[in-house]
Regions:
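Residue-level recognition of tetratricopeptide repeat
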Residues: 114, 148, 165, 181-182
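Register position in tetratricopeptide repeats
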Residues: 93, 127, 161-162, 194-197
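Terminal, low-structured helical/coil segments at or just beyond the last alpha-helical repeat
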Residues: 74, 169-200
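Conserved small-residue packing positions in alpha-helical repeats and bundles
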Residues: 48-52, 88, 122, 156
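Canonical tetratricopeptide repeat
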Residues: 86, 120, 154, 187-188
Length: 200
């Protein structure tokens, strides 16, 4: 009986060791996969932004813009957060601003480095007329993703609503450098005209 007990104990230890080894391999491979996924995500964005700047016409630019938005809305490592963002966006589009705000805030809590979560919350705050809070979230969005033309045009819209036309113009000028065919930059001449009139 003593001999059998030792054998059972030995087999148990082997099983535990195999389980620990499996767990270590699993988590290490997950980390590698996540890192690879994020690397792929960043590389695709880099390519799309080059294509966006070099687009020859509006139709070509719109296709690239959609690709960029698809990547922005996709968390590079966590599908669950992607699903949450989709839910919050749907609620926001349906006018459920308070619920959307809570969801976006929860995503930010879980991953404060995801620029699109900040941008979505900035958007819902804009819709709620909470301009100061929206501007704070836009600032954070641009710290994480300086090329975020959606955040720049959104900030320009807030400044237009606040009649701070020079700030609006500055943001749209930055947008044009990143995305020359952006529909938002079409109002640059109007803003310049308003500012010229104010100077007279």
């Amino acid at each position: 009986m003593g001999s059998n007990s030792k054998i059972e104990k030995s087999e148990l230890m082997k099983s535990i060791f195999k389980f620990i080894l499996f767990i270590n391999l699993f988590f290490n491979s997950s980390i590698i996969f996540s890192a690879a996924s994020e690397y792929y995500h960043k590389n695709k964005l880099e390519k799309f932004f080059i294509d966006l700047k070099n687009s020859k016409n509006l139709n070509e630019a719109i296709v690239v813009e959609k690709n960029i938005w698809s990547l922005w809305n996709l968390h590079p490592q966590n599908q669950f957060l992607t699903n949450k963002l989709e839910l919050g966006t749907e609620l926001m589009q349906n006018g459920q601003h308070n619920y959307a705000y809570k969801i976006f805030s929860n995503i930010i809590y879980e991953d404060p480095n995801w620029s699109e979560a900040w941008n979505k919350r900035a958007t819902v705050l804009f819709l709620m007329k909470e301009y100061d809070l929206s501007l704070e979230d836009i600032k954070k969005t641009l710290e994480l993703e300086p090329r975020h033309f959606g955040a720049l045009t959104g900030r320009a819209q807030i400044y237009i609503d606040l009649m701070e036309y020079q700030k609006a113009l500055d943001n749209l000028t930055l947008t044009k450098e990143i995305y020359p065919f952006s529909r938002g930059v079409n109002i640059i001449p109007k803003l310049e005209k308003i500012l010229n009139i104010e100077e007279i």
